[in-house]
């Protein structure tokens, strides 16, 4: 190269080949404008420096209710409506459909309140007449008449008293219908009334003759509970285990299907339980799979449906073990004490988890 100054040509730029196109993406802005930069400073202002907001508009209390004069035509109701008025009362009755038609005719909002005009003196007379009524109640225990006369009658308390007295009537009628069964064996069942608890009966049930539970003695409690519609609901709880699909985990017998009425007595319960023990095979055969799963012990009901000989053999074994049954005419160890309740089974669950 020469050190002498001279003219030189600028370097030639390389032209892009036509086959390749260079694409350049637009750079994403990363700088935050100065007016939008976050401020982390905390500034303490004096009370005089705090900016004051604009005062709220003055509140105007709406006018009291406005009453339309009596017998105003329906076409003139819209003349009495004002925005500053709280409510507009109509002293005579107007059908809602007529108000809707009037609103459509006026092409506006109708906000009237339609009320029936009643003379206050008539209402006052009705109230006094109601308070002066004498309510007579018959007490079943003391056979006395209770007179409750007006001046501050508590009608809610009065309804509770009537309900309790009605329940007493139902309980007394049931006890009178069932008391003759005490100490008598009816359909293989004998009961004793619990003197400490009302409507509690201790029952001893003999296994039905000809059934798979024959020879066993089963102890149960029958509890009658009042219900809200002036009726009684029976509940049966066994203290002796029965290999039966209607017996629940805690000894409760399934009461669905019982023909129980207000005039029923304990004999209806006896027949229902005994027939359920005697006709267990027929009851299982007529049920479908969903009904078997709905029973108290689905595993036992499935066994009875699929393998009846095994179910029958297992049920007889439990009768001999738990209910003092007999083997070939000879009494087992538990048969000697079959009339005495076994206390060691009172507080235990009698559920069968698996069957081998």
Swiss-Prot record:
CC annotations in GO: axon; cilium; cytoplasm; dendrite; nucleus
A molecular-function term among this protein's GO annotations: ubiquitin conjugating enzyme activity
Presence of the UniProt keyword Magnesium in the record: no
Keyword set, alphabetical order: Cell projection, Cytoplasm, Nucleus, Ubl conjugation pathway
Main localization of the protein described in the UniProt heading: nucleus
Residue numbers spanned by region Disordered: 1-83
Segments of skewed composition (Basic and acidic residues): 63-76
Domain of life: Eukaryota
Tissues where this protein is expressed: Expressed ubiquitously.
Residue span(s) of domain UBC core: 169-324
GO biological process: DNA damage response; protein polyubiquitination
The keyword Cytoplasm is annotated on this UniProt entry: yes
Comp. bias (Polar residues): 18-32
Cell compartments where the protein resides: Nucleus; Cytoplasm; Cell projection, Dendrite; Cell projection, Axon
Subunit structure: May interact with pmk-3.
Family: Belongs to the ubiquitin-conjugating enzyme family.
Function in brief: Possible negative regulator of polyubiquitination. May modulate the activity of the p38 MAP kinase pnk-3. May have a role in axon termination and synaptic transmission at motor and mechanosensory neurons. Plays a role in intraflagellar transport in cilia and cilium length regulation.
Protein name as catalogued: Ubiquitin-conjugating enzyme E2 variant 3
Originating organism: Caenorhabditis elegans
Record lineage: Eukaryota, Metazoa, Ecdysozoa, Nematoda, Chromadorea
């Amino acid at each position: 190269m020469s050190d002498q100054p001279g003219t030189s040509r600028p370097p030639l730029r390389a032209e892009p080949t036509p086959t390749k196109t260079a694409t350049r993406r637009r750079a994403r802005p990363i700088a935050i404008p100065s007016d939008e930069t976050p401020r982390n400073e905390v500034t303490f202002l004096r009370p005089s420096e705090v900016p004051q907001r604009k005062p709220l508009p003055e509140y105007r209390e709406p006018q009291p209710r406005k009453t339309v004069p009596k017998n105003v035509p329906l076409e003139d109701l819209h003349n009495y409506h004002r925005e500053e008025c709280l409510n507009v009362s109509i002293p005579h009755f107007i059908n809602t459909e007529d108000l809707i038609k009037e609103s459509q005719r006026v092409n506006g909002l109708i906000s009237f309140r339609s009320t029936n005009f009643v003379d206050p003196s008539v209402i006052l007379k009705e109230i006094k007449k109601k308070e002066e009524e004498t309510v007579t109640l018959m007490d079943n225990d003391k056979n006395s008449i209770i007179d409750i006369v007006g001046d501050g009658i508590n009608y809610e308390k009065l309804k509770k008293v009537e309900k309790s007295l009605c329940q007493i009537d139902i309980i007394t009628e049931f006890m009178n219908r069932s008391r003759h069964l005490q100490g008598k064996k009816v359909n293989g069942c004998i009961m004793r009334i619990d003197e400490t608890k009302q409507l509690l009966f201790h029952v001893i049930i003999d296994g039905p003759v000809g059934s798979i539970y024959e020879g066993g003695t089963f102890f149960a409690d029958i509890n009658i509970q009042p219900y809200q519609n002036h009726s009684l609901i029976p509940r049966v709880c066994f203290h002796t285990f029965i290999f039966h699909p209607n017996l629940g985990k805690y000894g409760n017998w399934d009461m669905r299907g019982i023909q129980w009425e207000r005039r029923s007595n304990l004999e209806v319960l006896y027949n229902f339980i005994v027939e359920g023990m005697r006709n267990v095979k027929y009851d299982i055969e007529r049920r479908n799979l969903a009904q078997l799963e709905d029973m108290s012990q689905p595993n036992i009901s499935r066994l009875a449906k699929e393998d009846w000989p095994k179910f029958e053999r297992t049920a007889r074994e439990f009768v001999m073990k738990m209910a003092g049954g007999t083997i070939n005419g000879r009494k087992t160890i538990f048969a000697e004490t079959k009339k005495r309740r076994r206390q060691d089974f009172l507080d235990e669950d009698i559920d069968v988890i698996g069957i081998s």
